[in-house]
A protein has these predicted regions:
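Charged, often flexible domain-edge or linker segments that flank or initiate folded functional domains
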Residues: 2-16, 91-94
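N-terminal [4Fe-4S]-dependent radical SAM core
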Residues: 8-38, 45-46, 209-240
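Flexible, glycine-rich loop/tail regions that form catalytic "lids" or insertion modules at the edges
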Residues: 38-41, 103
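Conserved alpha-helical elements of sugar-nucleotide-dependent glycosyltransferases
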Residues: 49-57
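Short helix-loop-beta junction
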Residues: 56-68
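A short beta-strand-loop structural module common to alpha/beta enzyme folds
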Residues: 65-78
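Glycine-rich beta-alpha loop elements in corrinoid/cobalamin-binding modules
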Residues: 75-217
Length: 240
């Protein structure tokens, strides 16, 4: 069966950026898992695949029988133009499925200049950019990586952030849209996990020079101070 993606690949540079199927990529039947997770890197394929953290978390999640982690990267301008022309939404490499139907999307925040790409990727997926505009029909959107320590510039976008090393915490924050908890109940539950920051559960006050004056919890489940997660035993985690 020829898909829309197959049809437009001949019109773009470096089409193998969008085909998947590389050595060591993971193929599962989405119907056999409980959670579909999209690991999103807001840059092109070449840059994303050079990132060691992606490989660690990708295989860490895919080692679980109940989870399917797929890769989602920012298309280059020629591919983006073709996607818009053909009404094609942002997709995952492994299955080619639209990420709108996933349970959770995790963006790694490696550098601030990628923030506009995060917004663009959500728009290409037809997913509301602001967390407050997304109900349970949309994926939960989380952020991690070095820039998550300064979360406020993009706090309105994300449902929550994972601070520190995610090899442990990623197992504790799985979200399935068909589960019993609604989005707020889910966020209240994970807000009690070490290293999890839920922006909507805090009021941020600014000084006149736009620096942060105070961060005050507005939800009883929110920790007064969120501390980064530290991996205590690297022998227990996946290493590519």
């Amino acid at each position: 069966m020829i898909t829309t993606r197959d049809k437009i690949l001949s019109a773009v540079m470096k089409p193998t950026r969008y085909t998947g199927g590389e050595l060591n990529s993971v193929i599962k039947n989405p119907a056999d898992v409980d959670v579909r997770f999209g690991f999103c890197f807001a840059d092109t394929y070449e840059i994303a695949m050079s990132h060691l953290g992606l490989k660690i978390l990708y295989h860490t999640l895919n080692d679980r029988e109940d989870t399917y982690c797929e890769r989602v990267f920012a298309p280059w301008t020629d591919m983006e133009e073709e996607m818009k022309k053909h009404g094609m939404k942002l997709f995952a490499l492994e299955t080619g499925d639209e990420i709108t139907h996933f349970d959770m999307l995790g963006f790694t925040l490696q550098y601030e200049l990628s923030y506009s790409n995060i917004v663009n990727m959500l728009m290409l997926a037809d997913i509301p950019v602001r967390a407050k505009d997304r109900d349970e029909s949309y994926p939960i959107v989380c952020g991690g990586g070095p820039c998550a320590y300064n979360a406020e510039p993009v706090a309105d976008i994300f449902d929550f952030f994972m601070l520190g090393e995610g090899e442990d915490s990623i197992h504790e924050v799985k979200w399935k849209k068909s589960g019993k908890k609604n989005k707020r109940d889910y966020l209240e539950a994970i807000a009690e996990i070490e290293g999890i920051y839920v922006p909507s559960f805090y009021d941020v006050e600014y000084n006149d020079d736009n620096t942060v004056k105070s961060v005050t919890p507005n939800n009883p489940h929110a920790k007064p101070k969120v501390r980064k997660r530290i991996m205590k035993d690297f022998n227990a985690t996946y290493a590519p």
